Regions:
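Helix-to-loop junction immediately C-terminal to a conserved catalytic motif
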Residues: 51
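Conserved ABC transporter NBD signature motif
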Residues: 59-70, 74-75
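Conserved ABC ATPase signature
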Residues: 132-139
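A short, proline-enriched helix->beta-strand linker immediately N-terminal to the Walker B motif
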Residues: 151-155
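Catalytic Walker B motif of ABC-type/P-loop ATPase nucleotide-binding domains
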Residues: 157-161
Length: 307
C-alpha cells in the first residue's frame, strides 16, 4: 500500500542530545500507528518533526511525496496536530477557538458550523461549547482539543497522548472514534497507556533514545519474541548470597532485585522450578508468573520502563 508519511534518515539533536537517530520508515495511508516508549525516548520529537514544527538536522520527511520543509504550506494543509497539553486562546470560548481554527484553514462558514456541531456531539463536549477553556476539566479540554484537530478534516493526524486525563468511559469513546477513522485517515499517536496501544493500532513502534527498538503488529512482535515468561518471587528476606546463586542459573534472563523480590525472565516455565529448588529453605511471601505482553516487550527492549 502507498505510504502517506515517509521518513528518510531523519535525525534531530536537542541540547547536544540525539532525540531522533537516523529514522527511516514509511506509514501506510489509512493506517493507525501507536508510538510508545519511556519518557525522552523521542516520541514527541517524532510527531513535531513529521508535522514540520521542528526541523531535522539531517534527513527529510515526506507527506504524500512532498518534502515537509520545502513545501510547508501544501503539507500543513493536510496535517492535523494535537499537542499533549491544551493550547486554546484563553480569551475565547471553545466555540470561538474552533471557529478561529477553521477560518485558518479557509473553511466555508456553513461547513465549519456543521463540523463543529458534529464533532462536539461525537466527542461529548457540546454542552461546554460556549464556555471558556479554563472553566473546563482537563478531560473536557482534551475532548475539545481532539475535535479541533479533526475540524478541517485533515487526512494525516498526529496526536500526542489522545486519552491522557480522560476517565475510562471517555477513553473507550475516543478509542472507538479513532478506529472509525481507520482507512480514511492516517493516524500516528503517542501514548503512555499500555491498554491504549494494545487496543488501537495497525502498527506498533517502540522507541528508545531516538531509535526504533521494535516495529510491527503486536501479535507478530510477541510471536517473534517466542516463549518468554516474567517471574517475580517475593521472599521474606532475600540475601545477597541467594540472589547471586539464583542469578548464576544460565537459563535466567535479566535478573534483578527489587527490595526482597527476585525479578527475572526465562524462555521456559521450568526455570521457575529450578530457581525454587535453590530457595527451598527460604520463607516465601508471594510469587507471580506471566507470559510476556506489551509491557514486558517494552521493558526488555528499552533501557527504562514506561511510567
Amino acid at each position: 500500500m502507498e505510504a502517506s508519511v515517509s521518513l528518510k534518515k531523519v535525525g534531530k539533536v536537542l541540547n547536544g542530545r540525539s532525540v531522533l537517530a537516523g529514522l527511516s520508515f514509511g506509514i501506510e495511508r489509512g493506517s493507525i500507528m501507536a508510538v510508545v516508549g519511556p519518557n525522552d525516548s523521542g516520541k514527541s520529537a517524532l510527531l513535531k518533526t513529521i508535522a514540520g514544527f521542528s526541523k531535522p538536522e539531517y534527513g527529510s520527511v515526506f507527506i504524500d511525496g512532498k518534502d515537509v520543509q520545502l513545501r510547508r504550506i501544501e503539507t500543513a494543509s493536510v496535517v492535523g496536530y494535537m499537542p499533549q497539553r491544551a493550547n486554546f486562546d484563553s480569551q475565547l470560548t471553545i466555540f470561538e477557538n474552533l471557529q478561529f481554527h477553521g477560518r485558518l484553514y479557509l473553511m466555508a462558514p456553513q461547513l465549519l458550523n456543521s463540523r463543529i456541531a458534529s464533532l462536539s456531539d461525537r466527542l461529548g463536549f457540546r454542552e461546554f461549547i460556549h464556555d471558556f477553556p479554563h472553566t473546563l476539566s482537563s478531560g473536557y479540554q482534551k475532548r475539545a482539543l481532539l475535535g479541533r484537530t479533526f475540524l478541517p478534516d485533515p487526512h494525516v493526524l498526529l496526536i500526542e497522548e489522545p486519552t491522557a486525563s480522560l476517565d475510562l468511559r471517555a477513553q473507550y469513546e475516543v478509542w472507538d472514534f479513532l478506529q472509525e477513522m481507520r482507512g480514511s485517515k492516517t493516524i500516528i499517536y503517542t501514548t503512555q497507556s499500555i491498554r491504549e496501544a494494545e487496543r488501537v493500532h495497525d502498527r506498533l513502534v517502540i522507541m528508545d533514545h531516538g531509535k526504533v527498538a521494535l516495529d510491527g503488529k503486536l501479535d507478530r512482535l510477541l510471536e517473534n519474541a517466542g516463549e518468554l515468561f516474567h517471574f517475580q518471587i517475593h521472599f521474606k528476606k532475600l540475601s545477597k548470597e541467594l540472589y547471586d546463586n539464583m542469578s548464576k542459573v544460565t537459563t535466567v534472563v535479566s535478573p534483578s532485585q527489587v527490595g526482597e523480590v527476585f525479578d527475572f525472565y526465562a524462555r521456559e516455565r521450568e526455570v521457575f522450578f529450578d530457581i525454587m529448588k535453590l530457595a527451598i529453605q527460604e520463607e516465601l511471601v508471594d510469587y507471580a508468573a506471566d507470559k510476556v505482553g506489551l509491557e514486558t516487550l517494552i521493558m526488555t527492549s528499552t533501557e527504562e520502563p514506561i511510567r
